[in-house]
Each structure stands twice: as structure tokens, then as C-alpha cells.
């Protein structure tokens, strides 16, 4: 029987082993989650570290702060979807979950780093010490309003122009203090006021 098949249909049987030896072609499937591409390799490595790590996260680097915190002019800062769009675009999350709040600042990194050497003022929680900017900075405060797991995160976007409160940490490689977290963006009162020695807004009588 086999001899008859080979004689009758020689070509298909000869091509069959070649087809079996060809590499399997995988079809690309689009997903809702934006996995990092080659130019986002560092983001992907950070994602793996956050997802599988059981200890504290790495302190932020200069490049991470520039990618995750600082913004450029483009979409209007008072746009209702600003935070939802920016957070997903910058892949801001923690262990596959939405972050509860976030600040984006319209400024250069060098300007932000200089704040680390300003005087200490109370943070918004009243416990830790923060450094406050000397001038007003434009930015957006993002507050989570819907969902807890990516990519369904929805945020309320609030435009602010005020004094930035940040925490800083020492980086051995640069031998400098660098921004660690954005604690608050405090809008000054509309009426006449001044800052006390502790950096607290005081309304004169």
C-alpha cells in the first residue's frame, strides 16, 4: 500500500516533511494592556520587579522621575481626561493595580531637583519633612475614582498652580539629592497672605 501511495502521489509526500520542519508562525494578538516595547525595556523590567518583589521598591532615578512625573505642553492641563490618558500612557501603576493618586508637573528636571535644597516645610500629612518650591508651578492632581486594576483605571483630573512639596533622597552615583516623591501641590489663597518661617500659609488679621 505504501509503495502504491508513493508512486501515485510522490510530490505531496515529499513536501510533507518540509512543511513539518518549518517553524511555527505565531499570529500577533492585540490586547487591551499596553505591554512595553523595545524602547520601554526599563519600564518592563521595573514592572517585573514590582510584581514579584516582596520588599521595598527601588528609589526613583532621574530618568524615572522625568518619565513618570514631568510633563510637557500638549494636551490642555484642564482636560477632563488628562490623568486617565497620561497615567496609562506613562504606564504608572503598582503591581498591576491602579495608583490612588498622582501628580504631574509642568517643569524641567533641573528645576525640580533644585527644590531638594530648599528649606524644609511640613508635608501635607504633618509627619515627614518636605522641600517646598520658591515659585508657583503648574501641574495636575490625579485622584482615582473608578476601578482598581489596570487598564480600567479612571481618574479625576484637577488643574493646579501652586507650591510643590516634595521629598528627596540621596543618590550615591550622582552624589546629589534627587526628587523622590511629590507630596502636594499647594495652591496659595486668592486673598493676601504670606508664608511663616515654617512654610505654612498664614492669613493676616
Swiss-Prot record:
Gene3D superfamilies: Ribonuclease A-like domain
The keyword Glycoprotein belongs to this UniProt entry's keyword annotation: yes
Subcellular location: Secreted
Any Gene Ontology biological process: defense response to Gram-positive bacterium
GO molecular function, one term: nucleic acid binding
Pfam families recorded: RnaseA
Signal sequence interval, chain numbering: 1-26
Disulfide pairings: 98-153, 116-168, 123-130
Keywords noted in UniProt: Disulfide bond, Glycoprotein, Secreted, Signal
Primary location recorded for the protein, binned into one broad class: secreted
SMART domains, A to Z: RNAse_Pc
GO cellular component assignments: extracellular region
Glycosylation sites: 131, 143
Its biological purpose: Does not exhibit any ribonuclease activity.
Family of this protein: Belongs to the pancreatic ribonuclease family.
Protein name stated in the entry: Inactive ribonuclease-like protein 9
Amino acid at each position: 500500500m505504501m509503495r502504491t501511495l508513493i508512486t501515485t502521489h510522490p510530490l505531496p509526500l515529499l513536501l510533507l516533511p518540509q512543511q513539518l520542519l518549518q517553524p511555527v508562525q505565531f499570529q500577533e494578538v492585540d490586547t487591551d494592556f499596553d505591554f512595553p516595547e523595545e524602547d520601554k525595556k526599563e519600564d518592563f523590567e521595573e514592572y517585573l520587579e514590582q510584581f514579584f518583589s516582596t520588599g521595598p521598591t527601588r528609589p526613583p532615578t532621574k530618568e524615572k522621575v522625568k518619565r513618570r512625573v514631568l510633563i510637557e505642553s500638549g494636551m490642555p492641563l484642564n482636560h477632563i481626561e488628562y490623568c486617565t490618558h497620561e497615567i496609562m500612557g506613562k504606564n504608572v501603576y503598582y503591581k498591576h493595580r491602579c495608583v490612588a493618586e498622582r501628580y504631574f508637573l509642568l517643569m524641567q528636571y533641573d528645576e525640580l531637583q533644585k527644590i531638594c535644597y530648599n528649606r524644609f516645610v511640613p508635608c501635607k500629612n504633618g509627619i515627614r519633612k518636605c522641600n517646598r518650591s520658591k515659585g508657583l508651578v503648574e501641574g495636575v492632581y490625579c485622584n482615582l475614582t473608578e476601578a482598581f486594576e489596570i487598564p480600567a483605571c479612571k481618574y479625576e483630573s484637577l488643574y493646579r498652580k501652586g507650591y510643590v512639596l516634595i521629598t528627596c533622597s540621596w543618590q550615591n552615583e550622582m552624589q546629589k539629592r534627587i526628587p523622590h516623591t511629590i507630596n502636594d501641590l499647594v495652591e496659595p489663597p486668592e486673598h493676601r497672605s504670606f508664608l511663616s518661617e515654617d512654610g505654612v500659609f498664614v492669613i493676616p488679621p
